Amino acid sequence: MVQFHSTAEGTSQLARGFFTGLFALAMVLGGLYLYQNKWEEVSRQMPILYELSDAYRSGLEAVGGISATALKRFYELDTSPDMFSEPEEKGPERIGLRSTWEKASILKKLEDAGFSKGKMRAAQKFVDYIDANKEAALVEMYRHKVPASINLAQALLESTAGQSRLARKTNNHFGIKARLSSNARQKVNAKRYDELRDEDFLFIDPAIGVFNFHDDHSYDRFEAYRSVSDSYARHTQLLTRPCTPGHTGCYSWIWQEFPVGQDHDITEAARIFQRASGIAPQEFFHGQTTVPYYAACAAGLKMAGYATSKTYHQKIWYLIDTYELWRLDLALLKGMEG
């Protein structure tokens, strides 16, 4: 039997419903506020200087800049695999690489900047990571033109300097996921997640398998590698695969568009991607549109949809600037002048 309520009762119920809904909304917004502030707090704990220095300008001037000859040799260099068949020719050392990057000087700079003991311990892990993996990054730069600074900064950020569980378990330092097979996609579409197995996921050489790690979904699988250098090689594949510039997920255009050792105006590229990225040219770096090559490359990654974080490109810039990773890029280019 349908019951009718008086106008007063209806108004009272409506009011209670309104305030209940308002309270729920406040709780959601409050939660988002706390989450965002918690993220900013965590982000601020990273061992990074959030103020850009003139060290890059000084460093570039100290080495006499990068000549047009070096740039031409580097970007037109034939680096087909057979060039590295001999052990002594497997990397940039063949051109007499001399880097000015030093762990001790970086740590001294950060100590002088007022880093706490906790941040200095974290910074020590970061410089140790850079020292251990700079050769892998330089080899990929030599072969495929992706700046070593970009590769290292991404790895530092995405694997917490190799300390994340995923990095320790799989040697996957860039969070590269395995793809769903057609069979796996059917199971996911039917929400039969408990039926998913490792063999339902696809991985690409040099990956040797997959690892179940909860990211967006509990069933996510990530690629696993024999070594960290294989992880760098796989990441470079992703950044240099043939694609159509202007499309989300296409990164290969970045490395030719923003050559090492120069400043670049990101305006034109940012406008091409603006509809997809939602970021205007002047919004990438607080109104600054002409930036060092590594900042332009970081912006290019963000333009093309590499990361969902709104400040991903800025974090990459800060990491490269804080740890002076540009010194590795310049060393390789200077080696091309000989």
Regions found by a protein language model. Name each.
Residues V2-L157, A161-G338:
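Catalytic cores of secreted/periplasmic lytic hydrolases that degrade extracellular macromolecules
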